[in-house]
Amino acid sequence: MELMVKGADALTVSETTFGREFNEALVHQVVVAYAAGARQGTRAQKTRSEVSGGGAKPWRQKGTGRARAGTIRSPIWRTGGVTFAAKPQDHSQKVNKKMYRGAMKSILSELVRQERLIVVDNFSVEAPKTKELVAKLKELELTDALIVTSEVDENLFLAARNLYKVDARDVAGIDPVSLIAFDKVVMTAEAVKQVEEMLA
């Protein structure tokens, strides 16, 4: 299949990478796994045995007319422990290579189908100026976009850093979450070739 390239000849790409059916279940699973992996998992609460104090019985067992109590750190008491206290845990989920590649191909194919993938011959700015990048995006009529280049472009990355809903990355920096987070994805022709090799 062929992808239209702005300002250059059409680019021939593999149908298995840019023309496959959308596997919603797989994409969902991989995106959820990425979100889970981003969780810190450091939340910690104290159980009744961990809360400081509560060693002495507050009052005697019988004869006071009050409900019996053995410790002031019981979960039903104010300042007591938490019944099912949250503990630090690892939320990460396993995503094997085949699943990851399948999800990436599904997302890229869907971007092509929805005409959200824009391929350009070259995309760069002369200086790390946000103003320059804004002008370039205006030419393409874009306000919400991920720009993917074949290699690290310091000027472009710095220019994009201060823009809302605009991000710039090299091929090594893209993942399923970044591809679906933006309205449009702008890729250089060289980046498309690299993505194809990476997912082959």
Curated annotation (Swiss-Prot):
Residues of the region (Disordered) are 42-65
Q: Which UniProt keywords apply?
A: Ribonucleoprotein, Ribosomal protein, RNA-binding, rRNA-binding
Q: Which Pfam families match?
A: Ribosomal_L4
Q: Name one GO cellular component term.
A: ribonucleoprotein complex
- Molecular functions per Gene Ontology: rRNA binding; structural constituent of ribosome
The protein's superkingdom reads: Bacteria
Check the record and name the InterPro entries matching this protein: Ribosomal_uL4, Ribosomal_uL4-like, Ribosomal_uL4_dom_sf
The record lists the membrane-crossing segments as: none
Q: Which GO terms describe its biological process?
A: translation
Function noted in UniProt: One of the primary rRNA binding proteins, this protein initially binds near the 5'-end of the 23S rRNA. It is important during the early stages of 50S assembly. It makes multiple contacts with different domains of the 23S rRNA in the assembled 50S subunit and ribosome. Forms part of the polypeptide exit tunnel.
Subunit structure and binding partners: Part of the 50S ribosomal subunit.
Q: Which family does it belong to?
A: Belongs to the universal ribosomal protein uL4 family.
Concerning NCBIfam families, the annotation shows: rplD_bact (TIGR03953)
Q: What is this protein called?
A: Large ribosomal subunit protein uL4
> Which gene is transcribed and translated to give this protein?
rplD
